[in-house]
Swiss-Prot record:
Gene: SCO2
Chain segment of the transit peptide: 1-41
Protein name as annotated: Protein SCO2 homolog, mitochondrial
PROSITE patterns reported for this sequence: THIOREDOXIN_2 (PS51352)
Entry's transmembrane regions: 61-78
Any Gene Ontology CC annotation: mitochondrial inner membrane
Subunit and interaction comment: Homodimer. Interacts with COA6. Found in a complex with TMEM177, COX20, COA6, MT-CO2/COX2, COX18 and SCO1. Interacts with TMEM177 in a COX20-dependent manner. Interacts with COX20 in a MT-CO2/COX2- and COX18-dependent manner. Interacts with COX16.
Amino acid sequence: MLLLARPPKAWHRLFQLQPLALLGTPGGKTQHVRYQLFSTPGPADTGRQGQPQGPGLRTRLLVTALVGAGLGGAWLALRAEKERGRQQQRTEALRQAAVGQGDFSLLDHRGRVRCKADFRGQWVLLYFGFTHCPDICPDELEKLVQVVRQLEAEPGLPPVQPLFITVDPERDTVAAMARYVQDFHPRLLGLTGSAEQIAQVSRSYRVYYSAGPKDEDQDYIVDHSIAIYLLSPDGLFTDYYSRARSAEQITDSVRRHMAAFRSVLR
């Protein structure tokens, strides 16, 4: 007999009957046929050749992601450390250049005498220019105050004092400076003085300037260096930014200098 009966619960597993062997008599006549039951794998199946299944695809992807995140974090930390090292070297090199050494005495746009010591304990962004400048000075001052506003919007950062020193003392009187700075930022201070005082502070910061010839209206252009200076709370020249640097780049640099300064004080 080939198959007498199967328990009802086994029928759902039955999907194929396959002959295993034909057993013959010595005379060559077939005596009977045995069959094996094939079924779908059950919960206890362990895979091919009786070996346990390996980790699933989801597990492998998770492990790969964790390893990648760890390597990425290590690379970013190493990059940040190298950047801090380069910045410290740059800061030391700039300070050794002895830029901004000595004091100055100038009048602000309210007529008050100002010296370098007045800004101790504050971060300062400083620009040299003149009020009759047609385009470059307004653009650079607007960029400077944009940096100040961006830093003001970040909680936990100290305020930055913006300064504007004229290189045209002949025309940039206290009243002229007052009219000019009000268009940029309420905390922007305009500083002016005598020709000798302006020459002294300009030499201190290595600022070149030269007044051009006057036209028939007695108007003239002043050729001068274009740079924004950063002074730390200890009054030291810390960095400078050329016209090619964007407000975002300057903001990021000032932020990093602030972090480095705090780490030294700890």
